Every structure is written in structure tokens, then in C-alpha cells.
Amino acid sequence: MPTRSAGPSCPIPLRRLFRRPAALALVGASLAAVPIFKTGPPPGHTGGFGEPTCRACHSDAGLNEPGGELTVSGAPARYEPGQTYQLEVVLRRAGMLKAGFQLAARFADGPAAGAQAGALAPTDARSIVTWDTLTHVSYVEHNLAGTALTGDAGHWIVRWTAPATATGAVAFNVAGNAANDDDSPLGDFIYTTALRVAPAARR
């Protein structure tokens, strides 16, 4: 499993650049310095537990703008300890040419709040799992192959194995990028969603 620490946010405040005509000559160099993350974002950009979202770089549109939608399905109403579930992440926005996502599963509250909850795994060659060496949280996210659309949507299927013991509710935080494929952070739309799954009642 690749290990990465949470990467830097965009080094250049792009909106401020465009407000200053004298700075326009710097735009080309600025964009070259901005990470595009076609092979997957740095860990820690789902928007959950105080994290930023992908808008840390793709910031010229508001979060969850009308016209797009990010959904997660396949999670149980209540999870059974140790059981494996298949989650489907779908991102839609008219006109997008590429798409990306990042998902984390963490305990929602209690003493373990924010800690890794269970295990994430890809189901195919369109996603990978990375590990944040600082927080010890894993993230499943797109890779280069996973940026290609399925029909008119970003579509990924991942596996989540529930914690071995029913420690508490699990929070899933997901961010998605509906991208225009212009190799810059401009013109992209970021969406987030979250869900909470409680453990099954003890028998």
C-alpha cells in the first residue's frame, strides 16, 4: 500500500493572481507549480474530520455547485463486524471530461473518533489505497486509469471490510472532482457527501 503524508494545498492563491493585472504574466508559471493529481490526490482531502476537500486546489467554483451530484451506495443500514461490503461511488456533472474521488472510513465518535474504521480495498485497476503516515488513516481514491468516465459519469467500486468488533458508528466521507481535463486546477467542480453507518445490534 502506498504511504503518503497529507500533501500541500495549492501554493498559489489563484483568485488573488487574477485580481491583479500586473500578476497575469505569472499565471503560466503558477499553474505549472500547481499539482493536478491525475494519479490520485494527497491523503486527507475528503472534507471529513476537519480535513480540506479537493477545493484546496480546484477552487474557482463553489463546493457542491448545482448541476452535479456525488453519491455513495452499497453501505448497509447497520454493519456486521468483519463483514465485507461493496461500495459504489458515482459522480455526475454535465460536460465533465474526467473525474476523480477520495473516500475514507473512520469511527464517527467516541474515544476512537477519526481513527481508521475497518479496511478499504480497490476492486479493479481504477482505484488505489493510500495511507497517511501522520494520521494512520487509509484512503481509497482514483488512479490515472480511474479518471476515465464510465458513460457520462465517474464511477468506482471499492470494498470496505467492517471493523472486527462493533466499536461504534462509522463515518464515510467522500470528495469527488468533476474535471474538464485541461491540466490545470481551473474549471473543475468539487462535490462532497457523507454517510454514517451504525453497528448491528448485539444479539
Predicted segment positions?
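N-terminal secretory signal peptides that target proteins for export/translocation
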Residues: 1-17
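Sequence context surrounding c-type heme c attachment/ligation sites in exported
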Residues: 2, 31-161, 165-203
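Bacterial N-terminal signal peptides
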Residues: 21-32
